[in-house]
């Protein structure tokens, strides 16, 4: 890390703190040459591999936006959506890879969304799983009821 004041390439860490709900680390550093102090933020980048092969950084906000559409008209708070997005990010990061397929993000959304709101779950699942008929909805509802009894 280069010092922003004198461009020296060595500094020591004075303080480290976890920020952004554990997704980043804030480090306070001191240059070993000029003793200038500066802050760095380190974040592990998680890349999403889309169906067409293009990659982009993971975005909790995209998860919230997608789920919010499914929750439209439902009594689901923004805080609940943010918690769900955090849970999804934790799930996809837990595999230890720096890349995740977009399809895996959709799978990671399904279970917590079903627990949050069943109607929103059905709406999201109908798009994610490409439902073609009312029969698809009926099958999914039967699956939900079976899982509810387990």
Swiss-Prot record:
Question: Where does this protein have coiled-coil stretches?
Answer: none
Give one GO biological process term: negative regulation of DNA-templated transcription
Q: Which InterPro entries match?
A: ATP-cone_dom, NrdR-like_N, RNR_NrdR-like
The highest taxon in the source lineage is Bacteria
Q: What ranges of residues constitute the unnamed zinc fingers?
A: 3-34
Q: Which PROSITE patterns match?
A: ATP_CONE
Cofactor requirement:
Zn(2+)
Q: How is the cofactor bound?
A: Binds 1 zinc ion.
Q: The ATP-cone domain covers which part of the protein?
A: 46-136
Which controlled-vocabulary keywords does the entry list? Answer: ATP-binding, DNA-binding, Metal-binding, Nucleotide-binding, Repressor, Transcription, Transcription regulation, Zinc, Zinc-finger
For this protein, the record's Pfam families field holds: ATP-cone, Zn_ribbon_NrdR
Picking any one GO molecular function of the record gives: ATP binding
Q: Is Nucleotide-binding one of the keywords?
A: yes
What family classification does the UniProt entry report for this protein? Belongs to the NrdR family.
* Function recorded in the entry: Negatively regulates transcription of bacterial ribonucleotide reductase nrd genes and operons by binding to NrdR-boxes.
Instruction: Give the protein's recorded name.
Output: Transcriptional repressor NrdR
């Amino acid at each position: 890390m280069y010092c922003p004041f004198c461009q020296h390439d060595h500094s020591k860490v004075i303080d480290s703190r976890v920020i952004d709900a554990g997704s980043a680390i804030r480090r306070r550093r001191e240059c070993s040459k000029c003793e200038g102090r500066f802050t760095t933020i380190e974040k592990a980048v998680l890349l999403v591999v889309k169906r067409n092969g293009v990659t982009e950084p993971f975005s909790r906000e995209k998860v919230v936006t997608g789920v919010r559409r499914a929750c439209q008209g439902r009594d689901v708070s923004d805080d609940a959506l943010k918690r769900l997005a955090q849970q999804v990010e934790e799930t996809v990061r837990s595999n230890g890879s720096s890349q995740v397929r977009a399809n895996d993000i959709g799978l990671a959304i399904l279970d917590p969304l079903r627990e949050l709101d069943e109607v929103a779950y059905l709406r999201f699942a109908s798009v994610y799983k490409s439902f073609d008929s009312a029969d698809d909805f009926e099958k999914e509802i039967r699956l939900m009821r079976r899982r509810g009894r387990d």
